Amino acid sequence: MSDFLPFSRPAMGAEELAAVKTVLDSGWITTGPKNQELEAAFCRLTGNQYAVAVSSATAGMHIALMALGIGEGDEVITPSMTWVSTLNMIVLLGATPVMVDVDRDTLMVTPEHIEAAITPQTKAIIPVHYAGAPADLDAIYALGERYGIPVIEDAAHATGTSYKGRHIGARGTAIFSFHAIKNITCAEGGIVVTDNPQFADKLRSLKFHGLGVDAWDRQCGGRAPQAEVLAPGYKYNLPDLNAAIALAQLQKLDALNARRAAIAAQYHQAMADLPFQPLSLPSWEHIHAWHLFIIRVDEARCGITRDALMASLKTKGIGTGLHFRAAHTQKYYRERFPTLTLPDTEWNSERICSLPLFPDMTESDFDRVITALHQIAGQ
């Protein structure tokens, strides 16, 4: 369908094209100076001392958990209402994911659910800043300090999000995503921010074969041509082609997120006349990045199931998303944790639907979505 409206579309323009051309013309297209520029720029955004660019947020999560020494016999607490990559990385390191419930209305993991899951084997807590809103960091970090457990913030949805006046990440260690649907994108990529220099050094080594330096450092830093392997590592570095796009996007972040916020405000106003329930906003002071606009489709209230709504919108040429099917209901995790029940996560997992939301979305696009929702609700 030529006029299909996707639920997300990257906002690319002349700046990104120029950035790519600059890198191509430079003769150095893999990890190099643009990575360094991106890391410095992201530190200015979040207020952290160190940033490590990686090939994806999943890669960032993998090496962050490795840098903490997570392994066999350890437990890591995280909500089930998250993308499965976090659970996968925990399992692949030999540790056990301890999935906890979320608040029914905000879909934020709560400190009460986290504390109830803490055991002597708990070695990390991973809160998720869901859909662009922040989790309650004061309470979560207080738990980490009380029990001596590191906190790694899953900030994949949170570029531009702030909590009580500070950008997400400023409290410690956080992982951001530059995936194609995120608030800023370079197709694929991510970045880890931290204030711990030893942790940052571990990340840099783990992301590039376990070497002490990367190819650009050897090229321009006068180092020996063959670097030393400090410990086995991975190939998770971000090419400068991608870093240059991310830099161009980062310069537009305020404008991109302002447009997202404007569309979200229009959605909230329109929902007053519709039976679909948006997520509630957290009660603490925050700035929402509006990565997603999510409604809950309860058949008893709306007269239609979520899946039927998504199918109906598709026939009208409108795309939607599901963020997320609860991780513990996926086949592998369902079979591994057959007795796990998380009532509020499960209730929402069966009803949530992400509506189209992206900076280049026009007023006509928005009107089309709302008209379709009215038509479906009136059937």
Swiss-Prot record:
Domain of life: Bacteria
InterPro entries linked: ArnB_NH2Trfase (IPR022850), DegT/StrS_aminotransferase (IPR000653), PyrdxlP-dep_Trfase (IPR015424), PyrdxlP-dep_Trfase_major (IPR015421), PyrdxlP-dep_Trfase_small (IPR015422)
GO function term, MF aspect, one: pyridoxal phosphate binding
Gene Ontology biological process: lipid A biosynthetic process; lipopolysaccharide biosynthetic process; response to antibiotic
Cofactor(s) needed for function: pyridoxal 5'-phosphate
Top-rank EC class of the record's enzyme: transferase
Keyword Cytoplasm annotated: no
Keyword DNA damage: no
Cellular component aspect of the GO annotation: membrane
Record Pfam families: DegT_DnrJ_EryC1
Coiled coil ranges: none
Family per similarity comment: Belongs to the DegT/DnrJ/EryC1 family. ArnB subfamily.
Quaternary state and interactors: Homodimer.
Role this protein plays: Catalyzes the conversion of UDP-4-keto-arabinose (UDP-Ara4O) to UDP-4-amino-4-deoxy-L-arabinose (UDP-L-Ara4N). The modified arabinose is attached to lipid A and is required for resistance to polymyxin and cationic antimicrobial peptides.
Name of the molecule in the record: UDP-4-amino-4-deoxy-L-arabinose--oxoglutarate aminotransferase
Species: Salmonella dublin (strain CT_02021853)
Gene that specifies this protein: arnB
